[in-house]
Amino acid sequence: MIETLISSKTRVKLLMKFFLNSSTTAYLRSLEEEFGESTNGIRLELNKFEKAGFIDSETQGNKKVFKANTRHPLFNDINRIIMKMVGLNHVVDYIVQRIGDLHKVYLVGKLANGQTTDIIDIVVVGENLNIPFLIEQIQKAEKKIDKKIRYVYYTVTEFDLAKIKEPGQHPLLLWSKEK
């Protein structure tokens, strides 16, 4: 869908990588491995994004590490577009409706790290949740966005953020009762 507006596949991948989850960082060689594209093409797009102020960089050792510039005036708009593109807005909308005492919903896995995937992994945290209703809402969301959704449910006492933080993973808080 967004590929129609933005013809560069590398640019779309970079938008997904950095604007879906603002805590994601990456350096050129890691992007080359992840995207399976040449460093030259990726470098050109990174330079354009950096010059426009969409991403920031810092040197860590001998690596130049990039991340989204969350202070950019268009950051929130781009983030919302990317969320809609991958269907996360529908997932959260469907889950939050009449679900019970929902506390938090996290995005984990490849999508949380800005990688393209047909599977959305979420973690649902709450008390006395209506699990049959949750399953029904997830199935509705899957049909609407044409992606598979895998979920894990934790009660508030069972949940520990460290459990869902694997090395190199950046869980993305999609919804919180405290918001």
Predicted regions span which residues?
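Catalytic core of pol beta-like nucleotidyltransferases
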Residues: M1-K13, F19-N47, K51-I99, A112-T117, ...
